[in-house]
Curated annotation (Swiss-Prot):
Positions annotated as active site in the UniProt record: R209, E238, H255
Pathways involved: Cofactor biosynthesis; pyridoxine 5'-phosphate biosynthesis; pyridoxine 5'-phosphate from D-erythrose 4-phosphate: step 2/5
InterPro entries: D-iso_2-hydroxyacid_DH_PdxB, D-isomer_2_OHA_DH_cat_dom, D-isomer_DH_CS, D-isomer_DH_NAD-bd, Erythronate-4-P_DHase, Erythronate-4-P_DHase_dimer, NAD(P)-bd_dom_sf, PdxB_dimer_sf
EC number from the UniProt entry: 1.1.1.290
Binding residue positions for NAD(+): Q127, V128, D147, T176, D233, G258
Protein family: Belongs to the D-isomer specific 2-hydroxyacid dehydrogenase family. PdxB subfamily.
Protein name: Erythronate-4-phosphate dehydrogenase
Assembly, per entry: Homodimer.
Binding site for substrate: S45, T67, Y259
Keywords of the record: Cytoplasm, NAD, Oxidoreductase, Pyridoxine biosynthesis
Segments forming a coiled coil: none
Compartments where found: Cytoplasm
Amino acid sequence: MKILVDENMPYAETLFSQLGEVILKPGRSLTADDLVDIDALMIRSVTKVNAALISKANKLKFVGTATAGMDHVDQALLKEKGIYFTAAPGCNKVGVAEYVFSVMMVLAQQQGFSVFEQTVGIIGAGQVGSYLQQCLQGIGIKVLINDPFKQEEGDEREFTSLDRLLQEADVITLHTPITRDGKYPTHHLINEEILNSLRADQILINAARGPVVDNQALKRRLQQADGFMAALDVFEFEPEVDMELLPLLAFATPHVAGYGLEGKARGTTMIFNSYCEFIGNELRAHASDLLPTAPVPKVVLDRKWDEATLHTLTQLVYDVRRDDAQFRREIGAPGAFDLMRKEYWDRREYSAVTLVGSAQCRLKPLAKLGFQVEVSQ
């Protein structure tokens, strides 16, 4: 059995080698020839699975993507060819939410505002958007959500129209897939008209898919230099990056918002377990068994936490400035975008840290944000 695996998928070689011969290749540059005699293909979002890629896949029976998003895979084609497909929904939701929160926290420090006085507008209430909503509301931040699909499906949450959200939110964060057809297409959802309507004190964050925002229109909006800010983890034509847009961004990173070690481990184990089930193998893997201890596994608090404490705790785990600085420093080199993703550091999630404190420390909201908490006597 031959299993072709994206070389950037952590823990994959160790896990899948239990099932057959593992062949590692860079996901973005896979060709049809690479799939000759391949039984299973394990990818990430940089691999476009289409008719051209599988044209020589004479043995392919299984495709798994270790990502929540699935828009890079022609699922109808795979179904037509009798090829089983699976994804890892929700695997990266924690990492993306913590990326967004880091952007908010750092900008709050830099610009002198309180995150607790901001209204956050979440566009897209799927796995990531819903988790982010839960975290922010858990610590007392006002949230507006927009998702016409969820609303029409009968989701009981209180939804907000896109127009109202764009008017009332101080922070607008995008968590939609990329679609070009249908009732609510998201390609260039944030277009020139919308960008020009945004206030100077608003912040736009895109950690979803690059083409959800018209990058040329965003560049023109930021060139007005009126105080409006944007942070991009995804770019419209990545791995190509508009070098005129880059210096205008508050933060820029190479599509790594969901690249926390826990999220990547979850994605890999989810498709590994699906493949084991597909081939009738009883092996199963658990992400928690693969993870090392965090560099700072425990923090003791001696008083009730406040916003300054929150800055310290969250930045102890993840500070977006680290990735932003590397991105600006290295993006000019050939192949830098994918190399930074391939060599991404072992970023952890808040859950890797246990906060210890008495009942007076009121740790429960921090547990809702994702930290482990332990109430001392």
